[in-house]
Amino acid sequence: MTAHPEFAVIGAGAWGTALASLYAAQGRRVALVARDSTKAAALATTRTTPRLPGLRLPDSLAVTARPPEAPVTLLAVPFQHLRETLGRLPQGNGTLVLCAKGVERESGALGPEIAAEMEPRRPCAVLTGPNFAHEIAIGLPAAAVLAMTDDGARRDLVQHLATPRLRVYGSADPIGAALGGAAKNVIAIAAGAVIGAGLGENARAALITRGLAEIARLTEALGGAAETISGLAGLGDLILTATGSASRNYRAGLAFGQGKRPDTEAGVIEGIATAPALLARARATGCEMPVTEAVTDLLAGRITLEASMNRLLRRALRDER
């Protein structure tokens, strides 16, 4: 690279490649960082990836295996590799933007909590929302939310990340934004499972709505704002992920509902690792998450789908909240 990039995008999967292509196509200096030199060389040569069929990487997009210094580094690696990836970044004071969605399996930590531990001196933001990678990559219109506690830095970064086809809203609640993006994957598995088992659209709508309520409860318990979950980071992302056929978590649920194993070759299914970690975090705060508990037990083989649905339906009746 002859000049330092404006953006370094760590992770050359579908989401990282889509973001890198989006910003490179806008004339930004962008470096896409693959996990090893072999993959980087292949991407640099072919300018294509099987993760995003039909997309050709912009000629200006640099591809490398070594993370460069950059004013803004977007981390789009599978969530369970976030801590390791942060440990390999070059020293610097550039802003970190967390683009992966999940909860750390071992600790139950959210992305902003991991970043605060690993890189306490760096500004950190969460970029999330209802965004399928393939649609972003080809420039279809979309909206996202950029969550960061520093008001001035957030306003500047929103301007930096918005494009004519991606509208970016600001939020001062990175915990709520991160939790909404992580937990919706679990609820999407539940939604897919009931459709796969032929239990109907009513059941899916009920699970999505009650799943949203339990995400909001945990958000408040962790110090976030419940209203964050009614926006793009929560409701918007949940609607897309729990109904869209391109959602890996929804498709995993469909497979479970049909008595099959999910296809893990198409990409990481974050909700599978997130469910038990999220449930443990909820229990530690005394927060009830019955849908998440049902998904966790279903994934572990401790309960059948029919039994889990009966357990949810037979909970004590009460006012909705």
Swiss-Prot record:
Principal EC category: oxidoreductase
This enzyme's EC code(s): 1.1.1.94
UniProt keyword annotation of Oxidoreductase present: yes
Per the record, the major location class is cytoplasm
Sorted alphabetically, the Gene Ontology BP terms of this entry are: carbohydrate metabolic process; glycerol-3-phosphate biosynthetic process; glycerol-3-phosphate catabolic process; glycerophospholipid metabolic process; phospholipid biosynthetic process
The record, for Pfam families, names: NAD_Gly3P_dh_C, NAD_Gly3P_dh_N
Where it sits in the cell: the answer is: Cytoplasm
Q: Active site: which residues?
A: K184 (proton acceptor)
Keywords of the record, alphabetical order, are: Cytoplasm, Lipid biosynthesis, Lipid metabolism, NAD, NADP, Nucleotide-binding, Oxidoreductase, Phospholipid biosynthesis, Phospholipid metabolism
The record's InterPro entries line, in alphabetical order, gives:
6-PGluconate_DH-like_C_sf, 6PGD_dom2, G3P_DH_NAD-dep, G3P_DH_NAD-dep_C, G3P_DH_NAD-dep_N, NAD(P)-bd_dom_sf
Q: In which pathway does it act?
A: Membrane lipid metabolism; glycerophospholipid metabolism
Origin, by domain of life? Answer: Bacteria
Matching entries from SUPFAM superfamilies are given as: 6-phosphogluconate dehydrogenase C-terminal domain-like, NAD(P)-binding Rossmann-fold domains
Presence of the UniProt keyword NAD in the record: yes
Q: Which reaction does it catalyse?
A: sn-glycerol 3-phosphate + NAD(+) = dihydroxyacetone phosphate + NADH + H(+); sn-glycerol 3-phosphate + NADP(+) = dihydroxyacetone phosphate + NADPH + H(+)
List the Gene Ontology MF annotations in alphabetical order.
glycerol-3-phosphate dehydrogenase [NAD(P)+] activity; NAD binding
Gene3D superfamilies, from UniProt? N-(1-d-carboxylethyl)-l-norvaline Dehydrogenase, domain 2, NAD(P)-binding Rossmann-like Domain
In which residues is NADPH bound? W15, R35, K101, A133, R248, V268, E270
Q: Which residues bind sn-glycerol 3-phosphate?
A: K101, G129, K184, D237, S247, R248, N249
Q: Which GO terms describe its cellular component?
A: cytosol
Quote the function comment for this protein. Answer: Catalyzes the reduction of the glycolytic intermediate dihydroxyacetone phosphate (DHAP) to sn-glycerol 3-phosphate (G3P), the key precursor for phospholipid synthesis.
Q: Which family does it belong to?
A: Belongs to the NAD-dependent glycerol-3-phosphate dehydrogenase family.
What protein is this chain from?
Glycerol-3-phosphate dehydrogenase [NAD(P)+]
Annotated source species: Acidiphilium cryptum (strain JF-5)
Source organism lineage? Bacteria, Pseudomonadati, Pseudomonadota, Alphaproteobacteria, Acetobacterales
